[in-house]
Amino acid sequence: MNELLLNLVDPLHQWFLGLGDGGVVLWSVLKILLIAVPVIVSVAFYVVWERKLIGWMHVRHGPMYVGMGIFQAFADVFKLLFKEILQPSSSHKAMFIIAPLLTLAPAFAAWSVVPFDAKLVLSNANVGLLYLLAMTSLGVYGIILAGWASNSKYAFLGAMRSAAQVVSYEIAMGFALVGVMIASGSVNLSQIVFAQAGNSGFFDWFLIPLFPLFIVYWVSGVAETNRAPFDVVEGESEIVAGHMVEYSGGAFALFFLAEYANMILVSFLISIFFLGGWLSPIQGWVNADISPWIDWLWKGGWPWLLMKVFFFASAYIWFRASFPRYRYDQIMRLGWKVFIPLTIVWIAVTALMVFYGVIQKGV
């Protein structure tokens, strides 16, 4: 399947290059659209899946109309886009509009270094991991700006909570990725996946030797995206809707889109860093060439990556339906007193495992 896709892309790339400088610009725009459009569509269907799955957990049907519920999210988007963006008279007009854009931009920019397969990546950067850390940290600036520009006590309190929460869990996430970097010997995301390849299938993945770091990264990812049970940033029962309380229409939709795009992104990154990305869990167990449509089951491919992502994306929904919201002090205590010390200890353990050959790079 990958070869068929590449056979279509390569001639198209050469045709654009033949157009000169304008063709290079058009090709860059096309690559951006090839990332942005699928992400937007994925968010739409993810919202439908969330409402449907929570409905089943609550023993009800969930969305049933608008194309049997499939196109419910698209109907919601059209509703929001046609609503007026109301600005409080005391707000900072320019910053009020810039804030949702500043939140959305990093959420989309981070996708440029995410590999979907060995060859399906927009930019195979050698500093991809560092780039991701930078991009995922920038989104909080839009939230802080929204809280300040709204000139609302609830919005400002939500923004301050977000800043403290992101700073707290960004440290734990960064330390967890230091362990991944030590185990793989690279900060290139594709090389991190290749480091988990081998003849033992899922036993070669970093999930087993780096399991504590996997748990820390997963939970910290939930906290970074401000999702339940860490959604004190927009806690409805406490501060109405936090930094989004004054936003409506398309501006609110941009915050919503950024949040769900980040949730899908974190699901991808967990799969890449700890579960072998596109690698098959039975890779190396079967050596057969039957058909390109079947061989991916044991050779690996993007369908495996999407299945792993689907699991973690669904886990976000499961957390929301199952766990109550933590108190703010409990969230801070978990980040500073549990996760950060645990990651520091396991970085040392990981270094020892690499030194003594317990963790070996893939073939």
From Swiss-Prot:
NDH-1 shuttles electrons from NADH, via FMN and iron-sulfur (Fe-S) centers, to quinones in the respiratory chain. The immediate electron acceptor for the enzyme in this species is believed to be ubiquinone. Couples the redox reaction to proton translocation (for every two electrons transferred, four hydrogen ions are translocated across the cytoplasmic membrane), and thus conserves the redox energy in a proton gradient. This subunit may bind ubiquinone. One of its GO terms (cellular component) is plasma membrane. It comes from Xanthomonas oryzae pv. oryzae (strain KACC10331 / KXO85). The keyword Translocase applies. One of its GO terms (biological process) is aerobic respiration. It is an enzyme of class 7 (translocase). It is a multi-pass membrane protein. Keywords: Cell inner membrane, Cell membrane, Membrane, NAD, Quinone, Translocase, Transmembrane, Transmembrane helix, Ubiquinone. GO terms for molecular function: NADH dehydrogenase activity; oxidoreductase activity, acting on NAD(P)H, quinone or similar compound as acceptor; quinone binding. PROSITE patterns: COMPLEX1_ND1_2. It catalyses: a quinone + NADH + 5 H(+)(in) = a quinol + NAD(+) + 4 H(+)(out). It holds the Pfam family NADHdh. NDH-1 is composed of 14 different subunits. Subunits NuoA, H, J, K, L, M, N constitute the membrane sector of the complex. InterPro entries: NADH_UbQ_OxRdtase_su1/FPO, NADH_UbQ_OxRdtase_su1_CS. Its EC number is 7.1.1.-. The chain crosses the membrane at residues 29-49, 62-82, 96-116, 127-147, 163-183, 202-222, 238-257, 264-286, 299-319, 339-359. It is found in: Cell inner membrane. Belongs to the complex I subunit 1 family. This is NADH-quinone oxidoreductase subunit H.
